[in-house]
């Protein structure tokens, strides 16, 4: 869904909103994903020289099942497993969520100069439970691969503030 247009009759306030939902199933065992996301922005002319912009976005990626990691024989040959084989467990997942909010004030001054103030805040979260195999399989004993599992949870927050004055001037 993508909606864009003026929010006031004179067009001095405009907006856009986008929402997307994507799902994927895989031929690989235990593997699928869901990806909702949204974005919105509003621009307002506060006069002939001043523009205010605010907006935000949200994105989520939910992957069910870990990425497959198939071993090979120690001589490099293929184990001839079916193409859909995934040695990870069905309970494995990899989820990411991200929020971002932003704003800007832009004012055009005399003689082509521009003054801008920008602010942005973002939050990102990762939650992953995974398992994998590593190592080669001995073709004679069928021994060798190692199995491991783990969990990762992280949060990253960021705040950015920027003030900018730009324009042409003669130095010499």
Where are these regions (language model features)?
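Short alpha-helical linear motifs
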Residues: 39-43, 78-79, 140-141
């Amino acid at each position: 869904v993508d909606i864009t247009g003026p929010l006031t009759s004179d067009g001095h306030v405009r907006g856009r909103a986008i929402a997307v939902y994507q799902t994927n199933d895989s031929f690989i065992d235990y593997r699928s994903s869901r990806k909702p996301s949204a974005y919105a922005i509003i621009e307002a002319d506060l006069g002939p020289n001043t523009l205010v912009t605010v907006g935000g976005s949200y994105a989520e990626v939910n992957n069910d099942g870990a990425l497959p990691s198939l071993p090979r024989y120690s001589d490099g040959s293929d184990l001839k497993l079916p193409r859909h084989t995934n040695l990870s467990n069905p309970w494995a997942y990899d989820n990411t969520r991200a929020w971002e909010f932003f704003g800007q004030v832009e004012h055009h001054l005399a003689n082509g100069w521009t003054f801008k103030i920008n602010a942005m805040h973002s939050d990102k979260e990762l939650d992953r439970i995974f398992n994998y195999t590593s190592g080669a399989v001995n073709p004679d004993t069928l021994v060798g691969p190692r199995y491991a599992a783990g969990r990762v949870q992280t949060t990253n927050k960021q705040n950015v503030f920027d003030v900018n004055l730009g324009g042409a001037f003669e130095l010499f």
